[in-house]
Amino acid sequence: MVVVAILAAGRGTRMKSDLPKVLHPLGGRSLVERVIDSVEPLSPSRRLVIVGYQAEQVKTGLQSLHLEFVEQTVQLGTGHAIQQLLPHLEGYTGDLLVLNGDVPLLRTQTLEQLLQTHQTNQNAATILTSHLPNPKGYGRVFCNGNNIVQQIVEDKDCSPAQRQNHRINAGIYCFRWENLAQVLPHLEANNAQKEYYLTDAVTQVGQVMAVDVEDYQEILGINDRLQLATAYEILQRRVKEQWMMAGVTLIDPNSITIDDTVDLQPDVIIEPQTHLRGNTFIQTGSRIGPGSLIENSQLGANVTVQYSVITDSTIQNGAKIGPYAHLRGHAQVGANCRIGNFVELKNTELGDRTNVAHLSYLGDATAGTQVNIGAGTITANYDGVKKHRTKIGDRTKTGSNSVLVAPVTLGDDVYVAAGSTITEDVPNDSLVIARTRQVVKPGWRKKSGES
C-alpha cells in the first residue's frame, strides 16, 4: 500500500508570475498534473497535495482530479511540509511516496523501480538519485557498495573532494511511514534559512537505499521560464520519437509540436510548422499541414489539412480542408467534403460530399449531402441579441455572394440565385431570387450634365 504526497506549496518567485508555479502549463498539462499522471498507474490508496501559496487557485486548478489537499500555511521547508501530514495519516502503516510538484518529466517506470526497490529490501527510506554532468547546487549522496546511503551533504557544505562526487539527491523519496512519523516531530531548523529539511529525516529513519534514475533529465525541476522551455523541448522529443517509431511521418520534426494527449494512427503524415494540441485524434492516411493548428478535434482517415486552424471539431474520412480555413465551435464535416480557402465554420454540420470552396462563413448551420455553397455565401446568424440556425437541404446550391438570414430553412434541391438575400423559408425543388432588378439607363452620364 502506498500513499502519494506531492509538494506544491512553493511560490516560485523566479517564474516572475502571478500564477502558482505548479500550475504553469507544459505541453497541454500543468506541471503538477504531469506529476499526478506519473503516479496514477501505481494505484495509490490516497493522493495528497500539499498547498500553500495561492492555495485556493491550486485547488481550483486541480479540482477535477478528486485529490486531497493539505495546507502548509507558512512555508518552512520540505520537512515542515511533510509534518503537515501527521494528522492526516494517523494510524497508517504503509509507504509514503514524496514527489515535487515542479518535476514534471518523471516516468512511471522510474517510480515503479523506486517503489519495488524500497519494498523488496524493506528499507526505511529509499531515495532517487542521479549522476549529473554538472551537479552544482545539488546535495551529494554518498553510498557504500550496496547502495546504502551513508551521508547526504548539501552542495554548500561539500569539501573539494566531496564535490567530485556527481551523484545527487533528486528530492524524491519513498518512506516507511511508521519510521518517518516518529522522526518528523523532532526535526530542527538548524540552518541559515531556518527551515526544516526532509533530508534531515532521511538520515534518522533507519536503512536508506539509493536508486539511480537512468536519464537525469527525468528529475529536472522547473524554477524559471528557461527551465520550463528546456523541459518542453525534452517532452517534445519524447513524444515525437514515440510517434515516429509507431509509424507516423514527421517532416521536419523540429518545427512540429505534439501534445502527449494527442493520438495518431500509423501512416499519418505531419508537415512542417504544424501543431497538434489537446485531445486530438487523427486516423491513418491523413496528411496534416504545413502550417496548421489542430486542437481537441477528431479527424478521420485520408483527411488533408493545409494552412488551417481546427478546434473542437470533427472531420470525417476523405475531407479536404484549406488552405486558410478556420473550423471551430463543434463544427462537423462529413466524408469527402471540401472546405476551401478563407472559409469559416462555427457550430455547423455538413453532410457527406458537401463543398464550401471559398470565402464563406457558415455559423450555427446545418447542410445536407452534396450541397454546394457558392463563394461569398454568409449565414447571418446573429440578430444582436441571440443566434439563430440556418438549415440547408440535400443537393442545394447557393450562388455567389448570397446571404441567408437566420432563422431560415432551404429545402432539398434548391437553387439560390447569386447575390440573393434570403429571409424566408424556401421549399424543395425551388429557384429563389431575392435581389433588386438590374436597371440600365443608356446615356445617363451625358443627360445628367456630368462632364
UniProtKB/Swiss-Prot annotation:
EC number per UniProt: 2.7.7.23, 2.3.1.157
Entry annotation: catalytic residues: 358 (proton acceptor)
Catalytic reaction(s) noted: alpha-D-glucosamine 1-phosphate + acetyl-CoA = N-acetyl-alpha-D-glucosamine 1-phosphate + CoA + H(+); N-acetyl-alpha-D-glucosamine 1-phosphate + UTP + H(+) = UDP-N-acetyl-alpha-D-glucosamine + diphosphate
Pathway(s) served: Nucleotide-sugar biosynthesis; UDP-N-acetyl-alpha-D-glucosamine biosynthesis; N-acetyl-alpha-D-glucosamine 1-phosphate from alpha-D-glucosamine 6-phosphate (route II): step 2/2; Nucleotide-sugar biosynthesis; UDP-N-acetyl-alpha-D-glucosamine biosynthesis; UDP-N-acetyl-alpha-D-glucosamine from N-acetyl-alpha-D-glucosamine 1-phosphate: step 1/1; Bacterial outer membrane biogenesis; LPS lipid A biosynthesis
One GO term of the biological process aspect: lipid A biosynthetic process
Cofactor(s) annotated in UniProt: Mg(2+)
Binding site for acetyl-CoA: 375, 381-382, 400, 418, 435
Annotated binding of UDP-N-acetyl-alpha-D-glucosamine, by residue: 7-10, 21, 72, 77-78, 139, 154, 169, 223, 328, 346, 361, 372
InterPro entries the record matches: Bifunctional_GlmU, GlmU-like, GlmU_C_LbH, Hexapep, MobA-like_NTP_Trfase, Nucleotide-diphossugar_trans, Trimer_LpxA-like_sf
The keyword NAD belongs to this UniProt entry's keyword annotation: no
GO cellular component: carboxysome; cytoplasm; membrane
Region entry Pyrophosphorylase, spans: 1-225
NCBIfam families per the UniProt record, alphabetical: glmU, PRK14360.1
Family: In the N-terminal section; belongs to the N-acetylglucosamine-1-phosphate uridyltransferase family.
Protein name: Bifunctional protein GlmU
Organism: Trichormus variabilis (strain ATCC 29413 / PCC 7937) (Anabaena variabilis)
Gene: glmU
